[in-house]
Amino acid sequence: MPQMAPISWLTLFFIFSITLVIFNMKNYFCFFYNSNESCQNLNIKQYKLNWKW
């Protein structure tokens, strides 16, 4: 069974690492969250508390 040179392991490591980083960046920056619309549809009562110590 042939053995791989250390430079081949390094190139594989860098390729998979860069692929992982690009995939995570794509998923992180392509997700759009509309918080204003979802908060306006829900009628949540907010209570203000004045704490006096």
Swiss-Prot record:
Cellular component GO terms, alphabetical: mitochondrial membrane; proton-transporting ATP synthase complex
Tree of life domain: Eukaryota
TM segment ranges: 4-24
Subcellular location: Mitochondrion membrane
Bilayer topology term: Single-pass membrane protein
Gene Ontology BP annotations: proton motive force-driven ATP synthesis
Similarity field: Belongs to the ATPase protein 8 family.
Protein known as: ATP synthase protein 8
Chain's gene name: mt:ATPase8
